[in-house]
From Swiss-Prot:
Biased composition (Low complexity): 351-362
Transmembrane segments: 25-45, 66-86, 141-161, 166-186, 253-273
Protein's UniProt name: ABC transporter ATP-binding protein RamB
Region (Disordered) residue spans: 321-362
UniProt binding sites for ATP: 410-417
Source superkingdom: Bacteria
Phenotype reported upon loss of the gene: Deletion of the ramC-ramS-ramA-ramB operon on rich medium leads to an initially bald (no aerial hyphae) phenotype; after 4 days develops a substantial aerial mycelium. Wild-type mycelium on minimal medium. No expression of SapB, normal expression of chaplins. A complete chaplin-negative plus ram-negative strain (deletion of ramR or the ramC-ramS-ramA-ramB operon) leads to the complete loss of robust aerial hyphae.
SUPFAM superfamilies the record matches: ABC transporter transmembrane region, P-loop containing nucleoside triphosphate hydrolases
Membrane topology designation: Multi-pass membrane protein
An annotated GO BP: transmembrane transport
Length: 608
């Protein structure tokens, strides 16, 4: 048995015992009706044997027909027995369903209640409408089949013993061998089934993700990697399916041994049995016990245990098992240096959107070397646009390591731009503290803030002046080589040549939105500020240009925070922050696909 199944059995055994202990009366009545079914199985075979030995072979057809009439009455009485069994079965299965529904509702309510984990329990609907019914049906099927096999087998074996003990010597060994072989296959079969399901789910999820992300895979050139990963998943699924098929073959062999070998053994041993005093009627009665009672019950038992049993175990563990713990956010790895982007000489102050000014010597002195401080740190930051308004950000804690590339994603209007404005210092939090390079940004003069960060908004600002002045707006001393390298890194050379070179005059109205964004991105790239904040600053670029720009910015000394416009930005980042209005989650692209339903939804929307 796998550790998963063993753990599930340990968790479920105590509540199962308590549930059955409170329903002893129903179980006793169910056993009494099942005992009647056992008597029915006994009578049918015994009556057939007597009808032959004491009736037809003895020359008394009336007596033979009378015994056959007894067998017929026993068969017809089965309808009343089945009705009684199902009436008592409801007394066990319906309370189980009611208890599971109550537990699922209580669990969902506790999650949403104050002090609970919080968040929407998206699995609650599945548990209430699907998993509870699966558990009810599977439990009912197992009770019926186990009860039927135990009591029918008891009646049939007792009938064989009453006809002649030698019959048990022939029938019991293959029956026990097949049943033992079947029981041996239960554990590895369940483990193989779990592996096959997991492999199939992983393959389906990858196929759906890849199909939805075709545009981004093509733009980022990651198609071959996705193809290799898909091929590995196909191979894993095929291997799991082969293993499952192998155990299924063993189970089929077990069913054949237990279900057909006793009949064959009885046929082969007819002469031996006749020599030991077994009558013809006893042989026919034995065949009746095997074919009409014992073997059908055994076949039903094996089928139910193989399918409904494992399904019931999994579903009950999901409903009654412990709530999965949320995965902890990965701690940012400390970097040895904050970065050399803070230069000691005076620099241009701020980006156009926060008002142009010039960084003074005091601002440069403020930008000291702080190796231990995070590049960005938010401590229980809350922001709301009014006393009675719902907070846009509520008690947000965030640490971004120096040199880290962080992408921020979430639905429109969730607070992504608000977050960048808070970090940039252009917006003050209602509560909490925002630090950049270890310094509180709220209330700092523009010159000091300009030495720490550059914020590039969605609507890029280009002013009337030369191309070089626009690119070097945040630096006073870029060398021609630095300008040329930056222009080349961002693919801006065709635009510069079209305009007439770095000394040519720019007319902003003649530039497209994407061209203006490229100019603003190069400007931010040349800035000495150690922190770059991009608020959907690449939304007007095509995917290839966006990837090229983000690669250049990520390769720059310092920290990069990007409010993502496309999925590819999150894929390229070291870490992604997901804002959903309730909680914030962070992790790599692969980690968030596994634990954040919202991130999976956004991934589908971005790529559709």
């Amino acid at each position: 048995m796998t550790s998963t199944e063993a753990g599930a059995l340990r968790r479920l055994a105590p509540p199962a015992r308590r549930f059955l202990a409170h329903r002893k009366g129903v179980l006793v009545r169910l056993a009494l009706w099942s005992l009647a079914e056992s008597g029915q199985a006994f009578l049918v075979g015994h009556a057939v044997a007597r009808s032959v030995d004491e009736g037809f072979l003895a020359g008394d057809p009336r007596r033979g027909l009378l015994w056959l009439g007894v067998a017929l009455v026993a068969v017809l009485s089965g309808a009343r027995v089945v009705r009684g069994v199902f009436a008592q079965l409801a007394g066990v299965t319906e309370p189980l369903r009611d208890g599971l529904v109550r537990h699922a509702v209580d669990r969902s309510m506790a999650r949403a209640a104050p002090g609970g984990p919080g968040g929407t329990d998206r699995a609650a609907v599945s548990r209430l409408t699907n998993q509870v019914e699966i558990a009810r049906d599977s439990f009912a099927g197992l009770v019926l089949t186990l009860r039927s096999f135990v009591f029918t087998a008891a009646g049939a074996l007792l009938g064989l013993l009453s006809l002649h003990p030698a019959l048990l010597v022939v029938v019991l060994p293959p029956l026990a061998a097949g049943l033992a072989l079947f029981l041996v296959t239960l554990r590895p079969m369940a483990a193989a089934q779990r592996r096959a399901l997991a492999a199939d789910e992983a393959l389906g999820e990858h196929a759906a993700s890849a199909r939805a992300a075709l545009r981004d895979l093509t733009a980022c050139g990651t198609g071959p990697g996705a193809e290799r990963h898909g091929a590995d998943l196909v191979a894993d699924a095929a291997a799991a399916a082969r293993t499952l098929a192998g155990w299924a073959a063993v189970r089929t062999a077990a069913l054949g041994v237990a279900g057909h070998l006793p009949v064959l053994a009885l046929l082969v041993a007819v002469e031996w049995l006749r020599g030991h005093g077994v009558s013809v009627g006893a042989l026919l009665g034995a065949f009746t016990y095997l074919v009409q009672s014992l073997l059908p019950a055994l076949h039903t038992l094996m089928t139910a245990l193989g399918a409904a049993g494992s399904r019931l175990l999994v579903v009950l563990d999901r409903i009654l098992g412990p709530e999965p713990e949320p995965e902890p956010e990965p701690e940012p790895e400390p970097e040895p240096e904050l970065g050399s982007g803070l230069e000691p000489e005076p620099e241009p102050a701020s980006e156009p959107e926060s008002g142009p000014s010039t960084a003074s010597a005091s601002a440069a002195a403020f930008a000291v070397h702080t190796a231990a401080a995070p590049a960005v740190e938010l401590r229980s930051v809350t922001l709301s646009y009014g006393v009675r308004a719902e907070p846009v950000l509520d008690a947000l804690d965030l640490r971004v390591a120096p040199g880290e590339h962080l992408a921020v994603v979430g639905p429109s209007g969730i607070g992504k731009s608000t977050l960048t404005r808070l970090v940039a210092g252009t917006l003050a939090p209602s509560r909490g503290e925002v630090r950049v390079a270890g310094r509180v940004v709220t209330g700092r003069p523009a010159a000091e803030l300009a030495a720490l960060r550059v914020l590039v908004p969605q609507d890029a600002y280009v002013f009337s002046g030369t191309v070089g002045d626009n690119l070097a707006y945040l630096r006073t001393d870029p060398s021609p080589a630095e300008l040329d390298a930056a222009v080349e890194a961002f693919g801006l050379a065709p635009l510069v040549e079209r305009l007439g070179g770095l000394d040519a005059t720019v007319r902003p109205a003649e530039l497209s939105p994407g061209e203006r964004q490229l100019v603003a991105l190069v400007r931010a790239y040349l800035s000495p500020a150690p922190l770059l904040l991009l608020d959907e600053a690449t939304c007007h670029l095509d995917p290839a240009s966006e990837a090229r720009a983000e690669k250049a910015l990520a390769g720059r000394s310092g920290t990069l925070v990007v409010v993502a416009h496309r999925l590819s930005s999150a894929v390229r980042a070291d870490r992604t922050l997901v804002l959903d209005g309730i909680r914030a989650q962070s992790g790599t692209h692969a980690e968030l696909l596994g634990r954040s339903p919202l991130y999976r939804d956004l991934t589908g929307h971005w790529n559709s």
